[in-house]
């Protein structure tokens, strides 16, 4: 809970500091926030805010969470992980597409991005209440369970199979981006032309600011203190 409170404060700070100039046009923006995908998800609409647009966008984010969250026992990704080394699991078009894209990025990056780092994420307790540093021996063992080339996709059957028992798919590094893309698409379909989708710091803008100018998005310097 402490981590979520810190995330909430950070998101609020980002929204106030980066986007306060958007209200200068005289249009009153509306925002809604929910805890989804393990973080604070906030949508701000500047031109045509409507309850229907907010509802549809957050429902789409929730749908993606229910498919891809590693923290939900009955999510598709959790079922894929439980079936590692045993059998292929049929999944939705959303999940198949995101895993397919994750593997493509893994290949292009030479493994710098790897969606099968789940065992290491779990061992380090990243995102949890009690993070720790595993021993070198534990890390060496868990690395044997990491390898994007051992994820087998069947496009015809739309299934995912992890070849070795103990492998864990973790889409945390890509699912929020996909959810932001989908939320923006839904907002556009509802006639929204100016909005910000902020999923725990994964920021996506829709259209231009209401005064026609470009958005300015601040990026934290990784070498400086926050």
Residue spans for each PLM region:
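Mature catalytic core of soluble alpha/beta enzymes
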Residues: 2-226
């Amino acid at each position: 809970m402490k981590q979520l409170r810190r995330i909430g404060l950070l998101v609020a700070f980002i929204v106030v500091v980066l986007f306060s100039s958007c209200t200068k046009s005289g249009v009153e923006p509306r925002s809604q926030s929910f805890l989804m995908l393990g973080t604070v998800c906030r949508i701000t609409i500047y031109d045509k805010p409507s309850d229907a647009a907010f509802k549809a966008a957050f429902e789409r984010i929730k749908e993606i969470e229910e498919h891809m969250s590693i923290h939900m026992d009955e999510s598709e990704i959790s079922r894929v992980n439980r079936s590692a080394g045993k059998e292929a699991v049929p999944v939705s078009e959303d999940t198949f597409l995101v895993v397919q894209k994750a593997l493509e990025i893994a290949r292009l990056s030479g493994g710098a991005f790897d969606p099968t780092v789940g065992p290491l994420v779990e061992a380090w307790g990243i995102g949890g209440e009690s993070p720790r540093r595993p021993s070198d021996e534990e890390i060496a063992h868990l690395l044997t369970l990491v390898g994007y080339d051992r994820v087998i996709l069947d496009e015809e059957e739309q299934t995912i199979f992890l070849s070795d028992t103990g492998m864990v798919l973790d889409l945390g590094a890509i699912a929020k981006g996909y959810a932001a893309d989908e939320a923006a698409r839904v907002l556009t379909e509802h006639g929204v032309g100016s909005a910000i989708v902020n999923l725990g710091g994964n920021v996506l803008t829709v259209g231009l600011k209401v005064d026609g100018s470009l958005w300015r998005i601040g990026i934290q310097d990784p070498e400086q203190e926050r």
